[in-house]
Amino acid sequence: MNSSISSRLSALRFFLKDHGLNGWIVPMADPHLSEYVDEHYAFRKWLSGFTGSAGSLLVTQDAAALVTDSRYWVQAEQQLEGSGIELVKLNQGYAAESADWFAAHLMANDCVGINSELISSKDAKNYARVFAEKHLHLSLVRQTPEETIWEERPERTEKPIFDHTVSPRNREQKLTALREVLKKEGAD
């Protein structure tokens, strides 16, 4: 097994034990749910060595798996070789595949955590529902392992904001439309 990946997974497992969790989901995501993330948020890549833009790492005290779609199966097999991380080929959706995998590796009523900033409320509800069907619990966690175990974590890069020139509407038109919707909904 790759020693750096093994030691990183061990550190995550200590975090889980210290926080009363039985498993952890590491998505490739940032707080904006971007498709491509800044290196500061590439925790899954740091833990597993897998560099594809899609996929989630699933970790328990005794096992780890990467769930990803068919675009990345060959790449994942190559990059995970010797890591001890199993490849789970996505067939039915991330929540369902994750629940199935955790159900096979955990006991009923065990708790799986995920960084609360890296999942949409819609996805969190879906994960919680499919996990409940497998008698597992999902915990949205604010104090996350990447803050404590990721040594030499890259700083966030500051990139300038730019206008999206392909859109038929300019920035002011988009903001006006947004303000109208907010006003209609009674939001501030």
What is each stretch, according to the model?
Residues 1-188:
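Terminal domain-start leader segments
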